[in-house]
Amino acid sequence: MKNPKLTVIRSLLVATSLGLLLAAGQPQGLAQAPAARPAKAFKYERLDKNNAAVLLVDHQSGLISLVQDFSPSEFKNSVLALADLAKYFKLPVILTTSFEQGPNGPLVPELKELFPNAPYIARPGNINAWDNEDFVKAVKATGKKQLIIAGVVTEVCVAFPALSALEEDYEVFVVTDASGTFNETTQQAAWSRMESAGAQLMSWFGVACELHRDWRNDIEGLGALFSKHIPNYRNLMTSYDAIQAAQKPAPKSK
């Protein structure tokens, strides 16, 4: 006959042993999780007209005919708006083309006319502009660390140099409406790839406003630029001009 006291003692020993084994198997610190680290504060990196350069990549007559994510007139207007704002803010501009003698065609003439003295790098075959030594030298010669990039096509001629510049610690701002490609699917994929790598996606209008900072710096000048490329903006400037004229004191009669 079994001794009841021995049975109870054995049960207690087994329970104690199991408890020790379970405790030993737990990761250290499980009972008290470490305090969560505070999230890193977001830093708003603004465009600075004193530290920015504009790279216009492969806006060539042949390549532009491939752009389908914007209408031809809409796209051309955005490209020229970016060019005009670069001139307005006196930003260094670098023009580059790829394989001009092939189907890509020459640089669109309006850009060459706007920037006759800008560095013009006709790449003999480099698909990625950053693979061209002369192009990179021209970028570095500006002394600017913020690069405003636009081009055709978005997933190649914009994305490749944008990613390369990010790798070399430049701040990259991609002008989405002055960059074009075959369709919205490739557009979105290219934007996602660049944004996830650290590029900021902006419109030409956003670029202009961020560079300008304050309307009081020059109302008429920036307003004229906007009116040239945004038809409805002319209504705002017409209204503003009328108010300004009405507020002027009448000339004194002699």
Label the predicted regions.
Residues 87-94, 116-119, 141-147, 170-175:
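Short, surface-exposed connector motifs at secondary-structure boundaries
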Residues 124-127, 177-180, 207:
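Short, acidic/turn-prone active-site loops that include or flank metal/cofactor-
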Residues 146-204:
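A contiguous pocket-lining binding segment that forms or flanks enzyme active sites
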Residues 29-120, 124-125, 188-195, 200, ...:
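Active-site acidic carboxylates
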Residues 1-7:
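N-terminal secretory signal peptides that target proteins for export/translocation
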Residues 11-23:
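Bacterial N-terminal signal peptides
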